[in-house]
Amino acid sequence: MPNYINYPSWLHPEVIQGIPITWYSLSYILIILISYKFIWYQIQSDNVDIKKEDYEIFMFSLVLGAILGGRLASTLVYDKSGIYYSNPWLILLPFDQHWNFTGFRGMAIHGGFLGAIIAPLITINTNLKNTNVQKYFLKLTDYGSIAFSSGYILGRLANFANAELYGRVMKGGIIFPNAEPFDTNIPGVKEFASSVGLEISPHDLLINLPRIPSQLIEGFFEGPVTFLLLWFLFKKIKKYDGFIFGVYVMLYAFFRFFIEYLREPDKELGFIITYKPITSLSEFSFLNISMGQILSLTLMLSGLIWIIVTKKIADKKIKNNTNLAYKN
């Protein structure tokens, strides 16, 4: 009996085949809409005095920053073809170098985090200077982390629809059509294929093996699990503004770091730190570290620094208010 699952033949990157609207693009539109509505809902629920027009300017800068940061990280860090360095306009255009429409493909969330902070910071110190958006910026970062995590899984579902970002070989896994096939001469490949019910003829040089659906596992832990922790736990123990955002960044980085062990390293990058070269299908080392894990460790440290800094800001406000009350 076969011990694997075939990738659904009816699932394609396009919502409707022949029409250039992809699940990936649709997922981002839905995430933006969910975040927009959910942040505004929290603002109103907590009676935070922010004008709708100021909020919309803030959200525009946040979304723009997240997209720019995500695209820059994806194209300049993860892509090693050099095409984006020689044709930088392709970073922001939905076309390939031959001007064929491709849609926007590739976003790195680590860069998205950075852009989603830098762009609003610029905006609140220029267009929104001396507004309540500037006053409540740290509170808005908390709202944003809760809102974004609530819709995050949609992006990973789109990755699954693209049959990309799949995991490592596993019995009972899914055979992704776009997965890189294995050389049948690699030690352990023939034995593994036989163990899951895949036949290899003497003339087969390559074979596609079942893999962990790591994009779905990532989506579950970095999306719903993280959202529930933020909403039902950390929101209740929050003592100052900015705390939840810092916790969110650390939670995301924590889950991402460990789930990366299940994920196939990026083909062009491989392992950035290789303690033990992989020479057979069964070999594995916790000390082989991918780019995603390095960036996640950096992100985790950034989240911790954010929590420390925002705590100091909160303590300073309390001290100033106490001194002011004492003087009065």
From Swiss-Prot:
One of its GO terms (biological process) is lipoprotein biosynthetic process. The keyword Transmembrane helix applies. Its main location: membrane. It is a multi-pass membrane protein. GO terms for cellular component: plasma membrane. A 1,2-diacyl-sn-glycero-3-phospho-(1'-sn-glycerol) binds at residue 156. GO terms for molecular function: phosphatidylglycerol-prolipoprotein diacylglyceryl transferase activity. Pathway: Protein modification; lipoprotein biosynthesis (diacylglyceryl transfer). It is an enzyme of class 2 (transferase). InterPro entries: Lgt. Keywords: Cell inner membrane, Cell membrane, Membrane, Transferase, Transmembrane, Transmembrane helix. Its EC number is 2.5.1.145. The chain crosses the membrane at residues 15-35, 57-77, 106-126, 242-262, 289-309. It holds the Pfam family LGT. It is found in: Cell inner membrane. Catalyzes the transfer of the diacylglyceryl group from phosphatidylglycerol to the sulfhydryl group of the N-terminal cysteine of a prolipoprotein, the first step in the formation of mature lipoproteins. Belongs to the Lgt family. This is Phosphatidylglycerol--prolipoprotein diacylglyceryl transferase. The lineage of its organism: Bacteria, Pseudomonadati, Spirochaetota, Spirochaetia, Spirochaetales.
